[in-house]
Amino acid sequence: MMSTKIDGKQIAAEIKTNLAERVNKLKAQGIQPGLGTLLVGEDPGSMKYVAGKHADCQEVGITSVKKELPADASFDDIAAAVRELNEDPACTGFIVQLPLPKGINENAIIDMIDPAKDADGMHPYNLGELVLHVRGDISTPLPCTPRGVLELLDAYDIDLNGKEVCVLGRGITIGRTIGLMLTRNAVNATVTLCHTGTRDVADHMRRADVIVAAMGSAGFVTPDKIKDGAVLVDVGVSRVYDEEAGRYRIKGDVDKACYDKASAYTPNPGGVGPMTRAMLLANVVEMAERHA
């Protein structure tokens, strides 16, 4: 079977080109979009991720608004930084980089974000809007990774109407939220959400036209668990030690041996990741356009 590699890097680049044009139009109206980030501590992964977001901003003409706090910052320190970003007119939307240091109530911090400035689309108000709006357009920010997955499939003309979609993992960042987006009238998929309590996960996977793997279990999706012609979307991230190279590598949930059996697949890395970052920028630009 001829399998299609779904190139997230290429589609994300096309989206960023479009966003840059829209940013220029906003600037012509005297509006300068700005993305804020709040980073607490010096976790290497978080620092790299935040730096990548600001590099993306520079590409499309979005201003960067950076706030950094030490690892021993108190809850009150972090809450004060969130309030400052809420009130900063240069910041159209912002994210609080997770995870926060141990002992900090992350949900309480996220609750403090102004929903209209929630660039990640993960504030309870915005998630509630997603639950309520089964029909019609949604004018609130959408979660970046699920939105990126749907944009990617749409770019490759993969129609999900009536399709069986098996989602592996029930995390709020992707598993639970993508189920809400997939079952909206505009998409119209039938979703099975599998998790650690699901019996016979492989049986659900073999029935699926599309599998969205977001477990963080390296190589969990193997050829014997999928049907011929399935579409595979790999969102999982695991650090696996490579004995030959003598270092850790990032591996996805989908075993590469599945690619030949699939009709289409997202590589990992290079599939969903670039789209998540592009959707963060899209949320910020759309926030600015709503106020134009």
From Swiss-Prot:
Pathway involvement of the protein, from the record: One-carbon metabolism; tetrahydrofolate interconversion
GO biological process: L-histidine biosynthetic process; methionine biosynthetic process; purine nucleotide biosynthetic process; tetrahydrofolate interconversion
Reactions this protein catalyses: (6R)-5,10-methylene-5,6,7,8-tetrahydrofolate + NADP(+) = (6R)-5,10-methenyltetrahydrofolate + NADPH; (6R)-5,10-methenyltetrahydrofolate + H2O = (6R)-10-formyltetrahydrofolate + H(+)
Gene Ontology molecular-function annotations: methenyltetrahydrofolate cyclohydrolase activity; methylenetetrahydrofolate dehydrogenase (NADP+) activity
SUPFAM superfamilies named in the record: Aminoacid dehydrogenase-like, N-terminal domain, NAD(P)-binding Rossmann-fold domains
Signal peptide residue numbers: none
CDD domains named in the record: NAD_bind_m-THF_DH_Cyclohyd (cd01080)
E.C. number: 1.5.1.5, 3.5.4.9
Binding-site residues for NADP(+), renumbered to this chain: 169-171, 196, 237
Keyword terms of this UniProt record: Amino-acid biosynthesis, Histidine biosynthesis, Hydrolase, Methionine biosynthesis, Multifunctional enzyme, NADP, One-carbon metabolism, Oxidoreductase, Purine biosynthesis
Gene3D superfamilies noted in UniProt: Leucine Dehydrogenase, chain A, domain 1, NAD(P)-binding Rossmann-like Domain
Matches recorded under InterPro entries: Aminoacid_DH-like_N_sf (IPR046346), NAD(P)-bd_dom_sf (IPR036291), THF_DH/CycHdrlase (IPR000672), THF_DH/CycHdrlase_cat_dom (IPR020630), THF_DH/CycHdrlase_NAD-bd_dom (IPR020631)
Annotated Pfam families: THF_DHG_CYH (PF00763), THF_DHG_CYH_C (PF02882)
One cellular component term from this protein's GO annotations in UniProt: cytosol
Main function: Catalyzes the oxidation of 5,10-methylenetetrahydrofolate to 5,10-methenyltetrahydrofolate and then the hydrolysis of 5,10-methenyltetrahydrofolate to 10-formyltetrahydrofolate.
Homology family: Belongs to the tetrahydrofolate dehydrogenase/cyclohydrolase family.
Subunit structure: Homodimer.
Protein name: Bifunctional protein FolD
The species this protein was found in: Bifidobacterium longum (strain NCC 2705)
